[in-house]
């Protein structure tokens, strides 16, 4: 995992953090809280995929060298490859990087077992989908953000049922659980929002919520969000977190160690009204999956 600049702050006492987590766990299980998953969930052990935008940018650069000044900027590096080598090359490289499947963690399995109306997963892997499939459930489906490059119609998302077959977005209303992947994913169809051009129209429209499916807006309306393994040091990450959680019930929470957050992350949490549960991610996950 790429190391981000820490700041010096006072930590919340551990007992307060764990008491808060115990309450959140009950609300999660009851479907009153939307889990918002980030790739740092994988950073605790051996992984076969990049777990930060910076590491993904470097992985792309290793396969198709980009300009040195943008080497650590995912969105710009992806745009460089798309512009110089064609969109098909970028998609092929992303597919190669994320091809190796990640085994679902205990938290993924726990979330798959709860009857959650909505799960937001912001990375490109297919791990949460795999956990839902392994649960044996068929009452769920997935909505992914898709690129509009090469499209001549207004399209923001595609929907897939539990088997991976593409279906009409209207089918999502009947699903007990929706897995929402706003940036796309390797499975089932290798959809990726990753280059600057992918985000041009999305960022133009996202403030008025156009790219976010109506069924997602409806399911978040009475819920709070719990950010797990998510970072906010990059403006793109902050924009999506703010807009996806917009017009929901509020009372959002994020699990992270405050002393490891960058200054702009702390500022974002304060401005967005997201309360920080200040504890190690590993310890928090252990509590969430216990019992």
Regions found by a protein language model. Give the residues of each.
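SIR2/sirtuin NAD+-dependent deacylase catalytic core
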Residues: 2-291
């Amino acid at each position: 995992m790429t190391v981000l600049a820490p700041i010096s702050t006072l930590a919340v006492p551990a007992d307060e953090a764990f008491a808060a987590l115990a309450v959140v766990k009950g609300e999660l299980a009851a479907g009153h809280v939307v889990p918002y998953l980030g790739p740092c969930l994988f950073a605790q052990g051996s992984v076969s995929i990049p777990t930060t935008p910076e590491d993904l940018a470097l992985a792309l650069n290793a396969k198709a060298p980009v300009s040195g000044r943008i080497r650590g900027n995912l969105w710009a590096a992806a745009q460089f490859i798309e512009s110089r080598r064609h969109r098909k090359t970028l998609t092929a490289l992303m597919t190669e990087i994320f091809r190796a499947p990640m085994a679902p963690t205990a938290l993924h399995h726990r979330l798959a077992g709860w009857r959650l109306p909505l799960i937001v997963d912001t990375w490109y892997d297919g791990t949460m989908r795999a956990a839902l499939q392994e649960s044996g459930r068929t009452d769920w489906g997935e909505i992914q953000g898709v690129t509009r490059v090469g499209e001549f119609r207004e399209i923001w998302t595609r929907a897939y049922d539990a088997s991976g077959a593409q279906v009409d977005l209207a089918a999502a209303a009947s699903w007990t659980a929706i897995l929402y992947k706003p940036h796309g994913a390797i499975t089932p169809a290798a959809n990726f929002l990753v280059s600057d051009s992918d985000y041009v129209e999305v960022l133009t429209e996202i403030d008025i919520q156009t790219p976010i499916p109506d069924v997602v807006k409806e399911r978040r309306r009475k819920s709070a969000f719990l950010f797990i393994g998510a970072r906010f040091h990059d403006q793109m990450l902050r924009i999506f977190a703010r807009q996806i959680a917009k017009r929901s019930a509020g009372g959002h929470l994020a699990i992270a160690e405050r002393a490891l957050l960058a200054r702009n992350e702390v500022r974002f949490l304060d401005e967005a009204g997201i309360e920080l549960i200040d504890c190690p991610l590993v310890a928090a996950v252990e509590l969430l999956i216990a019992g």
